[in-house]
């Protein structure tokens, strides 16, 4: 869904952002971890 897509996009952004921990979580495309970590 759109929320998951947004998280996948955030995975490509450098982790120097203040919410980098959320970016790391987003790399798994949500709670199910259905995506591939980047």
UniProtKB/Swiss-Prot annotation:
Cofactor: Ca(2+)
Record GO biological process: arachidonate secretion; lipid catabolic process; phospholipid metabolic process
Intracellular or extracellular location(s): Secreted
Principal EC category: hydrolase
Keywords from the UniProt entry: Calcium, Hydrolase, Lipid degradation, Lipid metabolism, Metal-binding, Neurotoxin, Presynaptic neurotoxin, Secreted, Toxin
EC number: 3.1.1.4
Family in the record: Belongs to the phospholipase A2 family. Group I subfamily.
Name of the molecule in the record: Phospholipase A2 1
């Amino acid at each position: 869904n759109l929320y998951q897509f947004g998280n996948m996009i955030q995975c490509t952004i450098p982790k120097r952002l203040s919410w980098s921990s959320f970016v790391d979580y987003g790399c798994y495309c949500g709670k199910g971890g259905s995506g591939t970590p980047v």
